[in-house]
Amino acid sequence: MKVDLFDFELPRERIAEHPASPRDAARMLDLSAADIQDRIVRELPDILRPGDLLISNDTRVIPARLFGKRGEAKVEVTLHKQEGLGTWVAFAKPAKKLRIGETFWVNDEFEAEVLDKKDGGEVVLRFNKSGADLIAALEKYGVMPLPPYIRRETGGDDQDKSDYQTIFAQKDGAVAAPTAGLHFTPELLANLDARGINRRTITLHVGAGTFLPVKVDDTENHKMHSEWGSISPEIADLINETRANGGRVVAVGTTSLRLLESAAREDGVVEPFEAETDIFITPGYKFRAVDMLLTNFHLPRSTLFMLVSAFAGFERMKAAYAHAIENEYRFYSYGDCSLLECASKID
């Protein structure tokens, strides 16, 4: 499909700079029924049914943006994928300032050797720390890798270190938040539990590729960055049991959905999963594992707007986004969300 089909005009003032407070006070455009309804997130338990299963992503965002030097030249890097112990692929700016074999220096105790350079401003860095020591150094010296459309002077501030983390966050490794999870509060989770709605988490370490623009003219020519994900045997069994009993699988965010679909067989059975996925979902895809999706409002021409168009229907999503813009919904990572029902399942 032509990428231009997924374009739309979005006024700059519709882009949220900070999350709603409290988080479950964010607005929610409900498309789970025939009519479009304006709701708020804390109404979610009233819409879902007892026996439904809510699947969230428990990845934790690391402060993956670093400001340092190569010699006297200032360089900024954003880590986006771990390749080995202490070794990460990163986007460097300006990449031309880094040369293979030289040192990217943050301070006297934190530095990395440039192992390789790739296309598109990517470099491979080997740090002088690994494991928990590397995470501790990132927490101390790094800043949150906020999307470029959220404006900050020098990257994420201290408030963003909590704002840009979901209530489900447990496992270090993401460099972008699974933003649909940002809407949940302890009170909302308690209300979901009281309603008899089951909850489990899976893990997909979101990479910075989620922010990359689609530069090709046709979706057939776009290549996704791969991301590592995991679904345990116990959770795979519960997903299959839920659907067999007539319950619905509700994915919290596109990252959860992409991982579930990556783990699903053609007959819809979800299998345990621990691998990389680069699944790219566009209209025409038949969904195997997910019945409903809670997701934020996405960028024009983005792979995520393509995904929701595939999930709920292209024309329906165009109408929904027009409604959201007209009614002043807040867009992107810190913005409001929509609740979608799948319109394109396997037979």
Regions found by a protein language model. Name each.
Residues 1-347:
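Surface-exposed, charge/polar-rich loops and edge strands
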